[in-house]
Regions:
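Non-transmembrane, aqueous-exposed alpha-helical and coiled segments at domain scale
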Residues: 1-150
Length: 150
């Protein structure tokens, strides 16, 4: 809440109750082995860092796209907390572990007169099957167009 006040998103700490969606807060750590929420074993050598993010005041079950792009950007800028957690090298792309798996993101940044600018952010997502099945409709309930004769 104090961060939201300092960023000018809210006027005072009490306003945070009605504005939990920003700022997004993420915790980063160096890569380590862990087990995802689906039970899949993620190896430290397969990721550059770990990220856990809060959304609406709760730990997010996976990773929000806005947070993923911010992580990519911060990893590309030398010396940031995210860059250091990812090993400190130049990172045009990073693979990070989150509660439900891994995600690869990237960013192209440039420094001009001491200011960093993002030229490009890269993120790819895969879809998962939400439902699969059959629907059986009795013949007598099948839709037929109304008669259009006057």
């Amino acid at each position: 809440a104090t961060g939201a006040v300092r960023m000018g998103l809210i006027q005072n700490v009490a306003d945070a109750v009605s504005r939990q969606h920003t700022p997004k807060v993420a915790f980063v750590a160096p890569s380590a082995d862990y087990t995802s929420s689906s039970g899949r074993h993620i190896r430290a050598i397969d990721i550059d860092l770990q990220v856990r993010a809060l959304s609406m005041g709760k730990l997010h079950h996976a990773m929000m796209g806005t947070c993923a792009v911010a992580i990519a950007t911060a990893a590309a800028i030398p010396g940031t907390v995210v860059n250091r957690a990812a090993g400190g090298d130049v990172h045009p792309s990073v693979r990070f572990g989150h509660p439900s798996g891994t995600l690869r993101v990237g960013a192209e940044v440039v420094q001009d007169n001491g200011r960093w600018t993002v030229r490009k952010a890269i993120m790819s997502r895969s879809a998962r099957v939400l439902m699969e099945g059959l629907l059986r409709v009795p013949q007598d309930s099948a839709y037929s167009a109304p008669d259009e004769t006057p």
